[in-house]
């Protein structure tokens, strides 16, 4: 079954997907979008569902617990996280899905990839994501 490895990975990370947060559904949709647009936008080195699940999605969200722990030690009200050279949105989009309490800024210089990122933001209803078209060197603060 497609998605079985993704579900098992989420369980290992103790990430619960339910009808309210729809984590699995959003990650599944994102993987399908990567597969659909990969050849046009060169987003990953594979279009295999399970490979994307393990090597890209689960790898991206493996940092979620550490990010939460780091955020607790900071005295800021709002935590902002930048994904510089976001490409196809990895690790930013998977992290934004599992950490909706944080703001994510996806910085990408290529127009077509920015268009892909904006599309994913809309499709996945990621209100905590901002796409910035820029080179990393030109980003201030």
Please report, for each region that a protein language model flagged, where it lies by residue.
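Class I SAM-dependent transferase core
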Residues: 1-76, 119-129
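Conserved SAM/SAH cofactor-binding pocket of Class I
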Residues: 61-141
């Amino acid at each position: 079954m497609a998605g079985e490895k993704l579900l098992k990975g989420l369980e290992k990370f103790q990430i619960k997907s339910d009808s309210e947060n729809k984590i699995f559904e959003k990650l599944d949709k994102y993987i399908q979008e990567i597969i659909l647009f990969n050849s046009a936008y060169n987003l990953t080195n594979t279009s295999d569902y399970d490979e994307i699940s393990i090597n890209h999605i689960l790898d991206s969200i493996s940092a979620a617990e550490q990010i939460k722990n780091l955020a607790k030690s900071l005295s800021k009200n709002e935590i902002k996280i930048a994904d510089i050279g976001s490409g196809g949105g990895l690790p930013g989009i998977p992290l934004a899905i599992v950490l909706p309490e944080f703001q994510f800024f996806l910085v990408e210089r290529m127009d077509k990839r920015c268009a892909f990122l904006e599309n994913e933001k809309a499709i996945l209803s990621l209100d905590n994501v901002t796409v910035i078209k820029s080179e990393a060197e030109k980003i201030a603060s």
